[in-house]
Amino acid sequence: MIGSLLKKIFGTKNDREIKALTKEVEKINALESEYEKLSDEDLKNKTNIFKERLKNGETLDDILVEAFATVREASKRVLGLRHYDVQLIGGMVLHQGKITEMKTGEGKTLVATCPVYLNALAGHGVHVITVNDYLAKRDRDQMSRLYGFLGLSSGVILNGLPTDQRKKSYNSDITYGTNSEFGFDYLRDNMVSSLDQKVQRELNFCIVDEVDSILIDEARTPLIISGAAEDKIKWYQISFQVVSMLNRSYETEKIKNIKEKKAMNIPDEKWGDYEVDEKSRVIVFTEKGVKRVEEILKIDNLYAPEYVELTHFLNQALKAKELFKRDRDYLVRDNGEVVIIDEFTGRAMEGRRYSDGLHQAIEAKEGVKIASENQTLATITLQNYFRMYKKLSGMTGTAETEATEFMHTYGLEVVVIPTNLPVIRKDDADLVYKTKKEKINSIIDRIQGLYEKGQPVLVGTISIKSSEELSELLKKRKIPHNVLNAKYHAKEAEIVAQAGRYKAVTIATNMAGRGTDIMLGGNPEFMALAEVDSRDDENFPEVFAKYQEQCANEKEQVLALGGLFILGTERHESRRIDNQLRGRSGRQGDPGESEFYLSLEDDLMRLFGSERVMIWMDRLKLPEGEPITHRMINSAIEKAQKKIEARNFGIRKNLLEFDDVMNKQRTAIYESRNEALAIDNLKDRILGMLQRNITEKVYEKFAPEMREDWDIDGLNEYLKDFYVYEERDDKAYLRSTKEEYIERIYNALVEQYNNKEAELGSDLMRKLEKHILFDVVDNRWRGHLKSLDALRESIYLRAYGQRDPVTEYKLISSQIFEEMIATIQEQATSFLFKVVVNTEPVKDEKNEIEADGLCPCGSGKPYEKCCGR
């Protein structure tokens, strides 16, 4: 209550921010008449003047007002568009590194131009992230004319773009692209073997369009670069054959205490081969089971080090047998594909696979084709990728409901920008029906009524399947319509652009078509481009003028009918997605209307609160097909959505807590790797690794206090195996301290290393150092990622032992990381001592080799691109 009273007196924090920025807008407006008088050349020259001022010590904030005024004037001349005051406010919010919430139709693409231009002047690059390739290319093509006029370069990163073109685009002042392309390029850049293979430069300033979709909805899925792992298909088959012969220990698993089991002297016939704890989803072999497996596979000790991987295969096979049920946890398609079923929604999760070999184990169980396992080569979450930018900002029509998560995860504040014109759209109360059938019949009747009236309607569904079902029913009533899904982005934009025309009926999944405004009466530019090839066509102005007049007349018809009608066929789990659908209507002060149709059989209603609504319906004795509307229902639905949003936030938060641990390790590896890339001579680094490794080994072998207990034989064997070194004086260690003996061995190995360098030549030795070091680092890092995956799979079991999984994960992963670093320095130095290079010259058989034949040197490259150059 006190808070609401203070808001009435002082206004909200958002109000105060808007008020402060409005004063800056007044300064920009004051320059407009002066800038209108500038010639094109003088206006273009502003860019050079700003850059010079920045060099002389001024900041971006110092030149903001003039830079924004410059962009506004250039936009008027080049694009024919003038920034509204609220668009300038939105631009300043983006420059401050915040999220700007602006309703649909407020021109977010134009909003970004001012902060993009201002920040690009510093010369460190600006990235603009969109949700798909189509929008990235469209926005870049549209705005490159403006940036080009002002002397700035722009590029776009598209899927499949060659490396040289990617590099060129990243070196532009402004770069457009999708989140996945930018993220994967970052990962690939940290897998290269030379600096000139990198494409990205520093991550400076980033504006994320549809920021809620990218930083929240897609944040649960990490970016992963994977490669084919060693083929182990036969082991999955063998493992399932083995566990098929084993029996579950139903009797003994009822007794939880191990000591109690032993004390009870349970007869052998009562013991099965394994026990299942369904609550914790854990399976363990009994002693009887271990012996049975050893007999079947004819091995001595199942838990010997060489059978560690086999044990993993057997455990996964047992999980597939006992814990994962067909048509509950997964389904098997006619083509033999095993598809996971989402435990919350019951929907098939296309393209998803269980990790750590479990999916292959299920495929073996079902007797279908087993897909090869992939190994993770590099991975990062979107959260940790975007948090690397020096300054991050974003824009969307719906961010306020997720403001807490934006602040917690990214440190981003949400500022709600007022609309240029008041929103006059009418949002009706939800209509709730008993059954899905009743709901669908009412939806079709309503669409038919709107179509006959001529009012355009956009029908929002939550799945492609629902869209297709509605489409079939509309076809039966001979109602012409368009169906949208998120498969064809370019076509999608064209259809959405015309969804505001007279008599238009458009069915779309809630997320489809974002980024394209629905203009009442139609979009004349899209219609003109359907008739002529491009804007540069000499006939374009004439054709555009024709459709402009047609669309203007049609708009008047649609306005008279009430504008665009939004019909939601189901509530989404997230309020934000529902608000996005509503926001398609009522742009720039246009009239509009929205209404949601629900049934008690909808997922959201079924899981939350449908019993109370059913009681109300029974009391009211509503006839079939009659809906109920009540603000209490809307309140119950909103509570349900908030619960689900909180759960999903928890999932993303948990993912990030785990990835933050890996992120520190990834950063350390990538930084060390990049330092090594920038150094031509790695000899000092290699010798430093050698010294650390020898020191650790001597202290390990000479750990006992008594000198006679030192393991000199073990140390000598190690030095011989790893460094081809033999100690000539077998009594030297008796006359030395540990430190003196370390120095003795190290000096001898350095001499040995220098001899090898003299033999091979310094140039070749430097190349070998780089090649071997990167090869070892990359291989060990991949192995480390696999270890972390396995650790995460098992870590939740520790929660049952009253231990926090994240704390345990941090502790164990840190130990694994230290072991990996030790292995890297051991393997890299050992390989360099043991490497043998064939320096025998290849005979000149140039005349006998075809130009496109393989080179005889054994490189595997064509002769003309290798020794024949």
Swiss-Prot record:
It is found in: Cell inner membrane; Cytoplasm. Its EC number is 7.4.2.8. It is a peripheral membrane protein. Zn(2+) binds at residues 855, 857, 866-867. Disulfide bonds: none annotated. It catalyses: ATP + H2O + cellular proteinSide 1 = ADP + phosphate + cellular proteinSide 2. The keyword ATP-binding applies. May bind 1 zinc ion per subunit. ATP binds at residues 87, 105-109, 517. Its main location: membrane. PROSITE patterns: SECA, SECA_MOTOR_DEAD. Gene3D superfamilies: Helical scaffold and wing domains of SecA (1.10.3060.10), P-loop containing nucleotide triphosphate hydrolases (3.40.50.300), SecA, preprotein cross-linking domain (3.90.1440.10). Keywords: ATP-binding, Cell inner membrane, Cell membrane, Cytoplasm, Membrane, Metal-binding, Nucleotide-binding, Protein transport, Translocase, Translocation, Transport, Zinc. GO terms for cellular component: cell envelope Sec protein transport complex; cytoplasm; plasma membrane. Its cofactor is Zn(2+). The keyword Hydrolase does not apply. HAMAP family: SecA (MF_01382). This is Protein translocase subunit SecA. The gene is secA.
